[in-house]
């Protein structure tokens, strides 16, 4: 191989190294936002659970006529990093807009397109057995204890049910949502 060819190959290799380094060095930039809340509490809510979304599914209007109800949908609030001392009970209190569509323990559901309240249907939230609770009324659940220490375990799960409740007449049709807040206290 001639000296010229060897020099050309070496030069090409060096240029290729610089080119690939330049290509590797190029990239993307962005930002990361880390957020949360430090609260005076014995537990932390699992990050995915502090903003719950419960998919109630596609519901046939016929099921809700004549005071019908849907099959309850289970949902949970998971707790972690709990440090219990003498606490025995966790009380979860849901609050939201109370429905005028049905008398009872129910929350208003709103049309996601118009923002208007649905007629003849509302949302019930209840304990794991399916007993509905009024807005602002606490749902008690026992703290699961560690048998070795007789103190609450570091991880706890609060179990609930949600379902729709119809009225005598047919409900409005369309996409809906109901928004509530919840607070957990430890006694």
UniProtKB/Swiss-Prot annotation:
One of its GO terms (cellular component) is pilus. It holds the Pfam family Fimbrial. Keywords: Signal. SUPFAM superfamilies: Bacterial adhesins (SSF49401). Coiled coil: none annotated. It comes from the Bacteria. Induction: Expression is negatively regulated by H-NS and subjected to cAMP receptor protein (CRP)-mediated catabolite repression. Gene3D superfamilies: Fimbrial-type adhesion domain. Disruption phenotype: Deletion of the operon under classical laboratory conditions does not result in any major effect on E.coli capacity to form biofilms compared with the wild-type strain. GO terms for biological process: cell adhesion; cell adhesion involved in single-species biofilm formation. Residues 1-25 form the signal peptide. Belongs to the fimbrial protein family. The operon is cryptic under classical laboratory conditions, but is functional when constitutively expressed. Part of the yfcOPQRSUV fimbrial operon. Could contribute to adhesion to various surfaces in specific environmental niches. Increases adhesion to eukaryotic T24 bladder epithelial cells in the absence of fim genes. This is Uncharacterized fimbrial-like protein YfcV. The lineage of its organism: Bacteria, Pseudomonadati, Pseudomonadota, Gammaproteobacteria, Enterobacterales. The gene is yfcV.
């Amino acid at each position: 191989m001639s000296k010229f060819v060897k020099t050309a190959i070496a030069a090409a290799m060096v240029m290729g190294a610089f080119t690939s380094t330049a290509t590797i060095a190029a990239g993307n930039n962005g930002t990361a936002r880390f957020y949360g809340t430090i609260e005076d509490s014995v537990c932390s809510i699992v990050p995915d659970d502090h903003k719950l979304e419960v998919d109630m599914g596609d519901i046939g209007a016929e099921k809700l006529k004549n005071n019908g109800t849907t099959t309850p949908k289970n949902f949970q609030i998971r707790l972690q990093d709990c440090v219990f001392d003498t606490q025995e009970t966790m009380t979860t209190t849901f609050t939201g807009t109370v429905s005028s569509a049905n008398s009872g323990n129910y929350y208003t559901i709103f049309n996601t397109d118009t923002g208007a309240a649905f007629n003849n249907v509302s949302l019930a939230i209840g304990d794991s057995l399916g007993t509905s609770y009024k807005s602002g009324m606490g749902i008690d659940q026992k703290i699961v204890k560690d048998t070795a220490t007789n103190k609450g375990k570091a991880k706890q799960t609060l179990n609930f049910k949600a379902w729709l409740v119809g009225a005598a007449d047919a409900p409005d049709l369309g996409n809906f949502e109901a928004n509530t807040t919840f607070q957990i206290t430890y006694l």
